[in-house]
Amino acid sequence: MTKVLVLYHSMYGHIETMANSIAEGAREVSGVEVTIKRVPETMDPARFAAAGGKTEQSAPVATPAELVDYDAIIFGVPTRFGNMTAQMRNFLDQTGGLWAKGALFGKIASVFASTGVGGGQEMTITSTWTTLAHHGMVIVPIGYGTAEMFDISHVGGGTPYGATTLAGGDGSRQPDARELAIARFQGKHVATVAAKMKG
């Protein structure tokens, strides 16, 4: 059984929605077991709620130590000024012990993201890759492997590096059908690669 983890941070629910679609796609691959988890929220709960954060998220909270249990990890990261959120950065900064043991070396990794008005979505994905490369993970982008990537009839997310969604400046825009289709493709593609590599 190939084990895939969809690991995310989501403040307003956009990445949570994308994570569910990523998982749907991964579950389409035979012999793959998919788990969705989130990183711990580091904001004070009262401040998080006051900022409009989505406090009800069904995914359990992950610990860095359990990353070794998976063959592939698909990271969901909101964009903050062209980088991952501090919550995801804090989580990954706790994986130094895993790095020292080479515990994630050779595991599959992929990244999807959200952003307000499009600024930094690609940079967020590629800057996240840097950390994953230090672990020796095998990074799987999505290229232009799905027809939705060529649909430019309206403004929306989607990059060859990974699925993205545009949340709008106030966060009111939710992932649309095209963005979710790209997310499902990413999940299926990564799970397929992971299953092939596991043999």
From Swiss-Prot:
Chain positions recorded as FMN binding sites: 10-15, 79-81, 134
GO molecular function terms attached to this record: flavin adenine dinucleotide binding; FMN binding; NAD binding; NADH:ubiquinone reductase (non-electrogenic) activity; NADP binding; NADPH dehydrogenase (quinone) activity
Domain of life: Bacteria
Entry-linked Pfam families: FMN_red
Cofactor: FMN
Keywords: Flavoprotein, FMN, NAD, NADP, Nucleotide-binding, Oxidoreductase
Record-annotated membrane-spanning stretches: none
Annotated source species: Tolumonas auensis (strain DSM 9187 / NBRC 110442 / TA 4)
Gene3D superfamilies: 3.40.50.360
Protein family: Belongs to the WrbA family.
Residues in Flavodoxin-like domain copies: 4-190
UniProt name for this protein: NAD(P)H dehydrogenase (quinone)
Coiled-coil annotated residue ranges, if any: none
Catalysis: reaction(s): a quinone + NADH + H(+) = a quinol + NAD(+); a quinone + NADPH + H(+) = a quinol + NADP(+)
EC number: 1.6.5.2
Binding site for substrate: 99
Positions bound to NAD(+): 12
Cofactor details (free text): Binds 1 FMN per monomer.
CC annotations in GO: membrane
